[in-house]
């Protein structure tokens, strides 16, 4: 699975906002500096997050960005969908809509299973979890397995 820079930056920006735990708007420049994200790229990402209802923006001298909902109500999946669309698709098609025939007919179930696995991690982890540096128990168990860290080519 490839994770785009846009997704990585969006998650880092949203987690940064959650970790600050403030109801005061945070300047885009402050988020960009704290996370080492190019400001121009971040501004577009924050626009996508705003359009999806993940963040709010305030104008003016005291303006900036803040989470639109409590951090414990925003999942990593919410952020990813806001900037990159569905968690899993095959050539732009959602797995459940694919049709395979003959020897490949079970491939659809594989792609649906991949999507379910992504959901089990990304829909079960909130920005609050990340800001508090904790993971859901089932994810802790997954990453505790040394095999999870093995690089395979």
Name each model feature, range by range:
Residues 53-67:
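Beta-hairpin "wing" of winged helix-turn-helix
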Residues 33, 50-51:
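Alpha-helical residues within the helix-turn-helix
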Residues 71-96, 108, 112-116:
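Conserved segment of winged-helix/HTH DNA-binding domains
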Residues 40:
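Key DNA-contact positions within bacterial/archaeal DNA-binding proteins
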Residues 10-22:
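Short amphipathic alpha-helical interface segments
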Residues 95-153:
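C-terminal regulatory/oligomerization modules of transcriptional regulators
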């Amino acid at each position: 699975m490839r994770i785009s820079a846009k997704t990585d930056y969006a998650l880092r920006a949203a987690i940064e906002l959650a970790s600050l735990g403030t109801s005061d708007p945070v300047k885009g420049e402050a988020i960009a500096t704290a996370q080492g994200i190019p400001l121009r790229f971040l501004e577009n990402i924050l626009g996508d997050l705003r359009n999806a209802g993940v963040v709010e923006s305030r104008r003016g001298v005291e303006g900036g960005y803040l989470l639109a909902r409590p951090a414990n109500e925003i999942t990593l999946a919410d952020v990813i969908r806001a900037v990159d669309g569905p968690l899993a698709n095959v050539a732009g098609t959602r797995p459940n809509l694919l049709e395979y025939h003959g020897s490949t007919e079970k491939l659809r179930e594989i792609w649906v299973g991949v999507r379910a696995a992504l959901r089990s991690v990304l829909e079960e982890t909130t920005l609050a979890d990340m800001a508090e540096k904790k993971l859901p128990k089932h994810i802790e168990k997954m990453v505790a397995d040394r095999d999870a860290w093995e690089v395979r080519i």
